[in-house]
Regions:
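Secreted/periplasmic carbohydrate-active enzymes, especially glycoside hydrolases
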Residues: 1-8, 19-347, 351-355, 409-410, ...
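Substrate-binding/catalytic cleft of secreted carbohydrate-active enzymes
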Residues: 338-452
Length: 452
């Protein structure tokens, strides 16, 4: 079976008295409910945790970060094929003055997310990590964050989920109401091919109900540890809105630090994004990027004006980072330079591929090999218009999580799942947001919705 409900059900005996805690969390008076922020429910954006202090961001050290808490739900009820798991989360006062998010990973099945008995979202994708904006649903003090694990309404397109510890790397975190909502970043050659250009777009958000100034900035260090550029900009954003701040500085010396497969230690530039308020830095978001640009030119996949020769290996991340690192090193030693997973991977998988100099063709969790040749309407899930929104949701979830990684050179619509209306719509959406890298679909079978 493509889900882990039975495994979760076995954990019921360990639930203890937590069930009583979950059932006893009452709704607060309406006057206590926080004002609605920029967004609510499921969101799509770059997967990155904000840090309180720069040294913690540099070290990726979450211990002691006040804006972060682990989410480790326990089973407390079962009914038919569904199992309820949850955690009573104690939200401190300082969090209620910000925007609160939940990151879910390794759930292993479809689920319905509720917070304090309010439905937040229903998710059919059993493998792709997901994020949710929770601010309208939470309050100071105890909050019941519950997942109802169930059979997916789109089970026929789910890949078998990875065998990892349930809910590993799931967490809640908060950001200031004036903060970084998302970003796009790339370090690419300039038009003369002599220098590099940092193309950075920071989406800033203001979750207050009125206009507020928001200051965002960045710095970038060379692979050798030299500070190359530092800048910040203030922008006034209307209440409950976002706006984009763009930076495009020249970065010199990049041709000596090209990110390419084959190198023993591919060079990576360190970028730190931050916000500033009243002279103090409020949050830090770290990122490592390689210099170069993957482009589709005249039907050829190129980098540094040379056609790429891809040696592919099908591989999904193992249960842990250490094992995955060993596997990836072994694949590289055998001459492979391109990794092709079956569905979106943990964020650390892309970090490893960045560090090792391995290309990745990222893939949405769409895997429906049965009846893939039946092109009647509804004959295959890929040609069932009722699933169009689900296909788009999965493609968006894949794209926004991994698009900023240097290792990702192309995006695949899914595994062998036939072709049809849903794949056409998915291709059109991806092409509307991705202007450089190709969109690939092996089962396009010569139709227009695949670039290679």
């Amino acid at each position: 079976m493509k889900r882990t409900i039975l495994l979760t059900a076995l954990l019921l005996c360990a639930a203890g008295t937590r069930a009583q805690d979950l059932y006893n969390v009452k709704e607060p008076p309406t006057t206590e409910i926080l004002s609605r922020p920029v967004e609510a429910g499921r969101i799509h954006r770059t997967e990155v945790v904000p840090y309180d202090k720069r040294h913690d961001a540099d070290a990726r050290n979450l211990a002691g970060v006040e804006a972060y808490m682990a989410y480790t739900p326990e089973p407390f009820a079962a009914s038919g094929d569904a199992v309820a798991v949850g955690q009573v989360v104690d939200i401190p006062y300082v969090w209620t003055d910000g925007v609160v998010y939940l990151h879910l990973e390794n759930v292993g099945t479809a689920y319905t997310l509720t917070v304090n008995d309010s439905k937040v979202a229903e998710v059919e994708d059993s493998s792709t990590p997901a994020e949710f904006a929770l601010t309208p649903y939470i309050r100071q003090g105890k909050n019941a964050v519950v997942l109802t694990l169930r059979r997916s309404a789109a089970d026929e397109i789910n890949a078998a989920p990875a065998s990892r510890k349930a809910f590993e790397n799931s967490y809640l975190y908060t950001q200031n109401k004036r903060s970084i909502r998302d970003f796009e970043i790339a370090l690419v050659p300039d038009s003369t091919r002599r220098f590099g250009v940092l193309k950075l777009a920071i989406v800033a958000q203001n979750a207050f109900n009125y206009d507020e100034p928001v200051t965002v900035g960045y710095d970038i260090y060379s692979p050798q540890g030299k500070l190359l550029e530092f800048n910040m900009q203030e922008i006034v954003i209307p209440g409950r809105m976002t706006d984009t701040v763009r930076f495009t500085p020249f970065i010199y010396g990049t041709n000596a630090n090209k990110w390419e497969p084959g190198a023993k230690n591919p060079p990576l530039y360190k970028v730190m994004l931050f916000t500033r308020r009243d002279g103090a830095y409020r949050e830090y978001m770290p990122m490592k990027i390689g210099f170069g640009k993957t482009e589709l030119i005249d039907g050829r996949l190129t980098r540094f004006d040379k056609e790429l020769k891809l040696v592919k290996a099908d591989y999904n991340a193992a249960a842990d980072r250490k094992t995955t690192l060993a596997d990836l090193k072994s694949l590289k030693a055998k001459g492979n330079n391109t990794i092709c997973p079956d569905y979106p991977q943990p964020a650390w998988f892309y970090d490893l591929c960045d560090e090792l100099g391995l290309y990745v063709i990222d893939c949405a969790n769409i895997n429906a090999p049965e009846k893939r040749d039946d092109r009647r309407i509804g004959g295959t899930p890929s040609n069932a218009p009722s699933l169009a929104d689900e296909y788009l949701e999965r493609v968006k979830a894949m794209y926004y999580r991994s698009r900023n990684h240097s290792c990702v050179i192309a995006f695949s619509l899914g595994g062998e799942s036939g072709n049809g209306y849903n794949m056409y719509k998915a291709y059109e959406w991806l092409k509307s947001v991705e202007k450089s890298r190709p969109v690939i679909y092996a089962d396009a079978d010569g139709e227009w919705n695949s670039d290679l």
